[in-house]
């Protein structure tokens, strides 16, 4: 069975929203790019919610000529959204009905892992359904110092149990914490 691997940027104070506005995104240094490219290379699909799609599509669709951009653009992308009717990013399929069951069926199909970007309602629903197998937190070494409850990694009512599988420190000061679901 395929695995769902979530890759998310988070600050020391737990903020996950709008990393493009952070003082330093920092994940796209050479060592960060290599890790992102390696993860993408072991996956054959990308999964995201609408908010992440709206941030990613204009950026990634305009890039090409490197393994990370080419991988993001060529892989099938699945977007959970009810209000997205005509996705412009190449190779995008909208999941607009019964997303958990649809994703469960995707996971049961033969193939490589599925990478999921962003950590919002979709991630919490995947975790609750036991479908999130691995969590990669790119821990950025600063506090944003502001935000609302929806800007945080933690959401009321969410629970899940993970075990640390790996940690990698980048030259930028970012630490990538890889956790695997205890239920898997």
Where do the PLM segments sit?
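Enzymes that bind and transform nitrogen-containing heteroaromatic metabolites
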Residues: 1-184
